[in-house]
Structures are given as structure tokens and as C-alpha cells.
């Protein structure tokens, strides 16, 4: 099975798998059952921003999700990713719909990782920024229903004539692997930011968007749609 660390923007509470009974952001370590959550209210049709950061000295993974002029939701969890992730990973965005649906539109995405070892000269970093997405992106691995549209947006789940479709799952991963930790590293850190737009014709949108880090050969697990956000094969 894949090794996944994720930050979920969960628009549909699935209390049977441990979700709180409200929309929330959560930190997921190798399971859809979040280690930490905080209440979050999706604003239909508005552009929001998610920022995720990790620092190996503090060993803390944090996320903040906000809308312009609105309050922000923050969640953090203390974890040593060296013990969980392989040294080389890929980073991605994932989303799904179930019976209920929503658009899972990404307008921009940036990521920076830094790895400092004892030798001052030997610092590795990776940085990318997408302010828009090209029609046939060479630097993204698109999985499932993910596609880029003529407006320069990344649609993680299927949209037909502007309407979100049920039972869709899709992911986009950056093509280059990231050296996320090293046993000789003094500091390993990363920051990710993406802007998103969730819009739903349903009173209950579903299911959500996640930023995730996985083994480099990660693919969408069978049966991982809906509440599993395209990340996990089951709800354990």
C-alpha cells in the first residue's frame, strides 16, 4: 500500500469513519481517520487559500485555510515525517465526489522544500509555482479524472458543462520527486500553498480536496472515491 501523509479539506462529514459532524480540515497520517481536525466552513463559489508547512526541527505539520475577509481555520499535529515517509516522495493534490458532488477546482499551486545537511554547501531545494495550468501539462502527472481546462485551471474531479459530476476521483502530482528528508539532514522543511474553488448545486457538497505526500509510484487506490478522497483503499 502507498504511504500517504495528507492535509484534507473535508466538505462532507463521514462520522462513521471518525469525522467530526461538521466540515473540517484535518491532518492524515497513513489513514483517512484524521489525527487532528478543526472546524472549517466551505464558502460556495469563493476562492480560498490553503497553506501547509512542516519543519523537521519543530516536527510539526501545520495547515491554515482561509477566504478573503473571512476567518481562517488552523490545524497542526506533531509528527516526525522521517519515521513515516520514504526519503524520496512525490507531492500532489487529490479530490473526490460521491453521490453528493462539488467542483474541486485548483487555480494555483506552489511548493518549496529545503534540505540542509551538516555540510553548509550541501543544501537541496525544490521549488515550483503554477499560477495557471497549461492544457497538456508536462510537469504534472494527472491521475483518474483530473484534467486542465481552457481557463488555465486544474479540475481534480469531472465537470461537465460547468456542472460537477458524482462519483469522480482525480489527482495531480508534480512530476519531479522531492528529497523530503535525509539521515544527515539538519533541517528538512517544506511549504505548500494552493488556491481552490469549491462550488456545488447540492446543499451538501462532497467530498473534499487534499494536499498529499506519497511514495513516488503512488496511484489512486481501487475503491478510494467518495469519503476516501482518492488517497486510501479503505477506512482503517
Curated annotation (Swiss-Prot):
InterPro entries: ConA-like_dom_sf, Lectin_LegA_CS, Lectin_legB_Mn/Ca_BS, Legume_lectin_dom, Leguminous_Lectin. Pfam families: Lectin_legB (PF00139). Keywords: Calcium, Lectin, Manganese, Mannose-binding, Metal-binding. Ca(2+) binds at residues 10, 12, 14, 19. Gene3D superfamilies: 2.60.120.200. A carbohydrate binds at residues 14, 99-100, 207, 227. The keyword NAD does not apply. Mn(2+) binds at residues 8, 10, 19, 24. One of its GO terms (molecular function) is manganese ion binding. Concanavalin A-like lectins of the Diocleinae subtribe undergo proteolytic processing referred to as circular permutation. The propeptide is split into an N-terminal and a C-terminal part, the gamma and beta chain, respectively. These are then religated in beta-gamma order to form the mature alpha chain. The beta and gamma chains can often be detected in cell extracts. Residues 1-118 of the mature chain, as displayed here, probably constitute the beta chain in the propeptide, residues 119-236 the gamma chain. Binds one manganese (or another transition metal) ion and one calcium ion. The metal ions are essential for the saccharide-binding and cell-agglutinating activities. Belongs to the leguminous lectin family. D-mannose/D-glucose-binding lectin that also binds derivative alpha-methyl-D-mannppyranoside. Has hemagglutinating activity towards rabbit erythrocytes. Homotetramer; dimer of dimers. This is Lectin CPL.
Amino acid at each position: 500500500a502507498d504511504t500517504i501523509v495528507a492535509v484534507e479539506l473535508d466538505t462532507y462529514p463521514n462520522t462513521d469513519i471518525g469525522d467530526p459532524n461538521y466540515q473540517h480540515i484535518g491532518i492524515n497520517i497513513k489513514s483517512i481517520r484524521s489525527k487532528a481536525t478543526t472546524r472549517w466552513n466551505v464558502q460556495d463559489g469563493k476562492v480560498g487559500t490553503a497553506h501547509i508547512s512542516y519543519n523537521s526541527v519543530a516536527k510539526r505539520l501545520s495547515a491554515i485555510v482561509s477566504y478573503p475577509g473571512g476567518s481562517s481555520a488552523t490545524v497542526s499535529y506533531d509528527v516526525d515525517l522521517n519515521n513515516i515517509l520514504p526519503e524520496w516522495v512525490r507531492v500532489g493534490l487529490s479530490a473526490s465526489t460521491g453521490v453528493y458532488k462539488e467542483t474541486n477546482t485548483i487555480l494555483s499551486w506552489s511548493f518549496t522544500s529545503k534540505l540542509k545537511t551538516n555540510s553548509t554547501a550541501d543544501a537541496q531545494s525544490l521549488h515550483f509555482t503554477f499560477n495557471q495550468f497549461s492544457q497538456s501539462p508536462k510537469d504534472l502527472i494527472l491521475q483518474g479524472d483530473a484534467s486542465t481546462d481552457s481557463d488555465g485551471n486544474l479540475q481534480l474531479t469531472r465537470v461537465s458543462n460547468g456542472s460537477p459530476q458524482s462519483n469522480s476521483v482525480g489527482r495531480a502530482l508534480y512530476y519531479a520527486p522531492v528529497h523530503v528528508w535525509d539521515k544527515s539532514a539538519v533541517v528538512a522543511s517544506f511549504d505548500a500553498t494552493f488556491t481552490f474553488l469549491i462550488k456545488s448545486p447540492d446543499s451538501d457538497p462532497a467530498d473534499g480536496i487534499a494536499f498529499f505526500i506519497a511514495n513516488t509510484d503512488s496511484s489512486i487506490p481501487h475503491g478510494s472515491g467518495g469519503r476516501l478522497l482518492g488517497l486510501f483503499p479503505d477506512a482503517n
